[in-house]
Regions:
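Domain-level signature for soluble enzymes in the chorismate/prephenate branch of the shikimate pathway
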Residues: 1-380
Length: 380
C-alpha cells in the first residue's frame, strides 16, 4: 500500500468515528433527560469504573492505556454535554458577565493604592506606571496589602508576582490561597538594581550588603564577586536603602533602584548589578471585587483538583480544546495537606470570546474548586 492508501483508510475510519461520536452524544442527551426526570446526578462513578474495567479487558494489550485515556475523555465530554443540556448551575460565567457589564469603560487615573515597602519601592514604581495620580498607602508585608483591600482601606493593591530572572514570588502565590481579591490589571516593570551606599563610600569599604531576597537572587552573579561580604535579607529593597541611609555606616550597602539613591541621599557604587540586563518583574493590581475593563485578554484562575491520575490533564485538554492559550501554570501546596496542590492558571483569551465562559463553566463541573481571580489586560 502507498501512503495515500493508508491516509484514505484513516479518513474513512475518522468519518465513521465522527458519526459514532455524534450518535453517542445524542444518546447522552437522552440520558440527561432521564436523569433530570428521575433527579439523578450527572456523574455516576460506579458506572464509569465498571466501563473502564471492561475497556481494559477488551482492548489489545499494547493499547490498553491509550484506550482508557480515550474513553476517560469521552466520559468527560459526555458529562459536560449533559450538564449544558440540564442547565446545571455555573457561577463563574455569570460572575464574568456581570463584571464586564458593571465595570466603567476607563481604568481610573487616581485611587488609594496599597504597596508593600517604603518610599521608592519597586511596587510604588509599578503603581506609578498604572495610575497617574495615586495616593500610596505603604504596607510592611504582602499579607497586609491583601488585608488593606479586604478591609476597605484602599481601592487597589500592587503585588509582585514573577521576575524574569528569579522566577515566581512564592510568598504572594501562597497568600492568594488565603485572601479574597480580584486581579484587575497587571504591569511589567523593568528592574535595574544598583549598589547604593553613603556618599564618599568606596566598593572596597563594603562588608555587608542588604536587600530583599528576590533582588539578591537577581544579582547573584555580582555577589559572587564579593566573597568576603555578608549578605543580609530584609523585607524590601527601598527599606534596605533607607536602612543604609539611617545607619551612618560606610561598610554597609543596599541593592535597590537609583530612585532610592535620590530619595535617601545615597550614591551608586555600581549600576545594573543584576544578572540579566533585560530584568523584568510582573506586578498585579488587585481589588476587592471583579473589575473587567475593555480590552481584557488575560484571565487568572486558582484551581483545586482531585488527587487522582488525569485530573490536571482533563483541565489542560479543555483549555486546548477551546483553542485558549495557557501562558502560566504554577502549582502550590495546600496548607495542612501533604499531597494536594492548587494550580494557578493564566489564560490568554478575550473576555468577549464565547469560548472563555464555556471553559469556565466546564471547569466548575470537573474540578473540586475553581476560584476566578479576574480578567484584565497587561501594561508593558
Amino acid at each position: 500500500m502507498e501512503l495515500s492508501d493508508y491516509r484514505a483508510q484513516i479518513d474513512r475510519i475518522d468519518a465513521e468515528l465522527l458519526q459514532l461520536f455524534a450518535e453517542r452524544m445524542q444518546t447522552a442527551a437522552g440520558i440527561a433527560a432521564y436523569k433530570k426526570e428521575h433527579a439523578l446526578p450527572v456523574l455516576d462513578t460506579g458506572r464509569e469504573r465498571e466501563k473502564l474495567a471492561g475497556i481494559v479487558k477488551a482492548a489489545p494489550e499494547d493499547l490498553q492505556e491509550e484506550a482508557v485515556s480515550l474513553f476517560r475523555l469521552l466520559f468527560s465530554l459526555s458529562r459536560g454535554y449533559q450538564r449544558s443540556l440540564l442547565g446545571s448551575s455555573s457561577t463563574l460565567p455569570e460572575i464574568l458577565k456581570r463584571a464586564v457589564v458593571t465595570t466603567p469603560q476607563l481604568f481610573p487615573t487616581s485611587a488609594a493604592v496599597a504597596c508593600q515597602g517604603v518610599e521608592g519601592a519597586y511596587s510604588q514604581q509599578a503603581c506609578d506606571k498604572l495610575f497617574q495620580h495615586p495616593s500610596v498607602f505603604f504596607c510592611a508585608t504582602f499579607d497586609k496589602v491583601f488585608a488593606a483591600i479586604e478591609q476597605g482601606l484602599c481601592q487597589y493593591g500592587i503585588l509582585p508576582l514573577e521576575n524574569s530572572t528569579a522566577g515566581s514570588v512564592n510568598a504572594v502565590y501562597d497568600l492568594m490561597q488565603k485572601h479574597n481579591f480580584s486581579i484587575v490589571r497587571s504591569v511589567r516593570l523593568r528592574v535595574d538594581h544598583s549598589l547604593l551606599a553613603l556618599p564618599g563610600t568606596k566598593l572596597s569599604d563594603i562588608r555587608e550588603i542588604v536587600s530583599h531576597g528576590q533582588a539578591l537572587e537577581q544579582c547573584s552573579e555580582f555577589l559572587k564577586q564579593l566573597p568576603n561580604v555578608t549578605v543580609t535579607r530584609c523585607e524590601n529593597t527601598a527599606a534596605a536603602a533607607r536602612m543604609v541611609a539611617e545607619s551612618g555606616r560606610k561598610d554597609l550597602a543596599a541593592i535597590a533602584s537609583n530612585a532610592c539613591a535620590e530619595i535617601y541621599g545615597l550614591q551608586s557604587l555600581q549600576d545594573r548589578v543584576q544578572n540579566e540586563h533585560g530584568n523584568y518583574t510582573r506586578f498585579i493590581c488587585i481589588a476587592a471585587k471583579p473589575e473587567v475593563y475593555p480590552g481584557a485578554d488575560r484571565t487568572s484562575l486558582l484551581v483545586t483538583l482531585a488527587n487522582e491520575p488525569g485530573s490536571l490533564y482533563q483541565v489542560l485538554a479543555r483549555i486546548y480544546g477551546y483553542g485558549i492559550n495557557l501562558t502560566k501554570l504554577e502549582s502550590r501546596p495546600i496548607p495542612g495537606s501533604d499531597d494536594t496542590f492548587r494550580f494557578y492558571f493564566d489564560l490568554e483569551a478575550s473576555v468577549y470570546s464565547p469560548e472563555l465562559p464555556k471553559l469556565l463553566g466546564e471547569l466548575e463541573s470537573i474540578c473540586e474548586h475553581v476560584c476566578y481571580l479576574g480578567s484584565y489586560s497587561e501594561t508593558v
